[in-house]
């Protein structure tokens, strides 16, 4: 369990527990959205290219049969509760962590409806969230997208976590203070 590892690091005194961030893309986006629906330990989260609703994802993504065959016991129309219970969207009301959602507009592996839907659900509930869409980019934006968009993506992520995790800069001191 990821929280067991985190607890071990915390117990050693290596980190400030008030400034924890979490994030991931694709499968990591699934894990991040699931994690922040289970705990409020994190001060900021990045959910990138997520799958948050496995039922809809199963019928619209490019690997549409994969999840039904390998992760679930049947198709979503035959086993809707299994899909819902394992989908991070069902935990959205519990989220207390500010969330940055990043989605590529040409992503067929985790189509836009997943990231946009998650963002919309957070906003409908009054949760702090920001959505960034990258046009003409695919699921591989972080590795092989247009260089300008890869740089922009990293700047957005850095800004998001810097604002939420780092202490504010100290006020300048003048001579005689």
Indicate where each model-derived feature is located.
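Active-site-proximal cap/loop segments of hydrolase catalytic domains
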Residues: 1-177
């Amino acid at each position: 369990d990821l929280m067991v590892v985190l607890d071990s690091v915390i117990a050693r005194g290596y980190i400030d527990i008030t400034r924890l961030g979490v994030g991931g893309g694709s499968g990591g986006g699934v894990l991040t959205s699931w994690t922040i629906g289970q705990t409020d330990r994190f001060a900021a989260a990045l959910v990138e290219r997520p799958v948050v609703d496995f039922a809809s994802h199963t019928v619209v993504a490019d690997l549409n049969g994969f999840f039904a065959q390998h992760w679930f016991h049947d198709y979503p129309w035959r086993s809707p509760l299994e899909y819902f219970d394992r989908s991070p969207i069902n935990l959205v009301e519990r989220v207390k962590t500010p969330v940055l959602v990043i989605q590529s507009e040409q992503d067929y592996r985790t189509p836009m409806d997943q990231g946009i839907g998650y963002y919309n659900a957070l906003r409908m509930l009054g949760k702090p969230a920001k959505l960034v869409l990258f046009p003409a980019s695919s699921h591989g934006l972080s590795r092989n997208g247009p260089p300008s968009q890869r740089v922009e993506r990293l700047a957005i992520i850095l800004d998001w976590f810097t604002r939420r995790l780092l202490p504010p800069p100290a006020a300048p001191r003048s001579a005689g203070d």
